[in-house]
Amino acid sequence: MTNIRKTHPLAKIINNSFIDLPTPSNISAWWNFGSLLGVCLILQILTGLFLAMHYTSDTTTAFSSITHICRDVHYGWVIRYMHANGASMFFICLFMHVGRGLYYGSYLFSETWNIGIILLLTVMATAFMGYVLPWGQMSFWGATVITNLLSAIPYIGTDLVEWIWGGFSVDKATLTRFFAFHFILPFIILALAAVHLLFLHETGSNNPSGIPSDSDKIPFHPYYTIKDILGALLLTLALAALVLFSPDLLGDPDNYTPANPLSTPPHIKPEWYFLFAYAILRFIPNKLGGVLALIFSILILAIISLLHTSKQRGMMFRPLSQCLFWLLVADLLTLTWIGGQPVEHPFIIIGQLASILYFTIPLVLMPIAGIIENNLLKW
């Protein structure tokens, strides 16, 4: 009798995706982050669901409802901090996952890669709206500043901003709609993740060498299920350590002050995972130029595959490209640091140089390095 997992319509899909899936035998720990993102997403949906049971999306009670969750709800503080720090873990895994894709040439699976970019943008939108919900000072002013960027769009900008706000300033209507979107978007992310996997399984996974591995595949279960469980355990350990020992490490103290439209915080800044893009936005003097640079700092990923000049797929055997890749990583860390600093000397010039470098490396230097490496192979 044929095994039910191979015949049952629903079990067959799960079997082909997570059990009998032919997987390259040499994929490293860098391939763990996809499953870790799945773990993070499920965790965020579950903790978010329990938070939504106690949260009120009204400007007068939003802040006190968060206080109520932390003080009165049974283990509410754990749920709240797991959700807040879970977002940080989510973005750490996202950056690692995208970095892996860039390093090993996974962007050449264009459908999977493009769905991934849409996923990244959706997750960023969700995280931004979630940051507004506690209705602290940084929530309010962050929402005001970031939504106001749309006013840089010629002709329709101001109308667009007021349409998003639901009035003439960030107020009750804004908070209510942000809560509604923040609740629905994770389920859209879940659906997009399924499409992302669907396209990935059309081609099969890439591997560190970048060489087709059809001749050397092993079943996903038990080899990679065990590996993924280990990754999930380490992630859970890191998250638990963060939540239980220093839950406010990655947060902003200003968000413990209730939102006050009459008092602007000295330094308005978003969560740490947006600081690199925020730094690029800030260090372009022109408003529209800054907004375009901000958008392009993410959308640059969409044209990476067009700039691939090397005859080899990954960077495993390309020392020049490796140097440039790690320079880009260092540059991103520099931008993240600068984004959290005040706009004054010497941070301005460092930010401008780091922003220029951020675009120069993938658009100019990496394609040139690819051509040089191709010619070096002829020697």
UniProtKB/Swiss-Prot annotation:
Role this protein plays: Component of the ubiquinol-cytochrome c reductase complex (complex III or cytochrome b-c1 complex) that is part of the mitochondrial respiratory chain. The b-c1 complex mediates electron transfer from ubiquinol to cytochrome c. Contributes to the generation of a proton gradient across the mitochondrial membrane that is then used for ATP synthesis.
Further comment: Heme 1 (or BL or b562) is low-potential and absorbs at about 562 nm, and heme 2 (or BH or b566) is high-potential and absorbs at about 566 nm.
Chain residues that bind a ubiquinone: 201
Family: Belongs to the cytochrome b family.
Principal cellular location given in the protein's record: mitochondrion
Descriptive protein name: Cytochrome b
A Gene Ontology cellular-component term: mitochondrial inner membrane
InterPro entries per UniProt: Cyt_b/b6_C (IPR005798), Cyt_b/b6_C_sf (IPR036150), Cyt_b/b6_N (IPR005797), Cytb/b6-like_sf (IPR027387), Cytochrome_b (IPR030689), Cytochrome_b_C_euk/bac (IPR048260), Cytochrome_b_N_euk/bac (IPR048259), Di-haem_cyt_TM (IPR016174)
Keyword Protein biosynthesis: no
PANTHER family reported in the protein's UniProt record: CYTOCHROME B
Complex and partners: The cytochrome bc1 complex contains 11 subunits: 3 respiratory subunits (MT-CYB, CYC1 and UQCRFS1), 2 core proteins (UQCRC1 and UQCRC2) and 6 low-molecular weight proteins (UQCRH/QCR6, UQCRB/QCR7, UQCRQ/QCR8, UQCR10/QCR9, UQCR11/QCR10 and a cleavage product of UQCRFS1). This cytochrome bc1 complex then forms a dimer.
Cofactor(s) in the UniProt record: heme b
CC cofactor note: Binds 2 heme b groups non-covalently.
Entry's localization field: Mitochondrion inner membrane
A GO molecular-function annotation: ubiquinol-cytochrome-c reductase activity
Gene3D superfamilies associated with the record: Cytochrome Bc1 Complex, Chain C (1.20.810.10)
GO term, biological process aspect, one: mitochondrial electron transport, ubiquinol to cytochrome c
Residue positions binding heme b b566: 97, 196
Stretches that traverse the bilayer: 33-53, 77-98, 113-133, 178-198, 226-246, 288-308, 320-340, 347-367
Species the sequence originates in: Ursus spelaeus (Cave bear)
Pfam families, alphabetized: Cytochrom_B_C, Cytochrome_B
PROSITE patterns: CYTB_CTER, CYTB_NTER
Binding residue positions for heme b b562: 83, 182
Topological relation to the membrane, as annotated: Multi-pass membrane protein
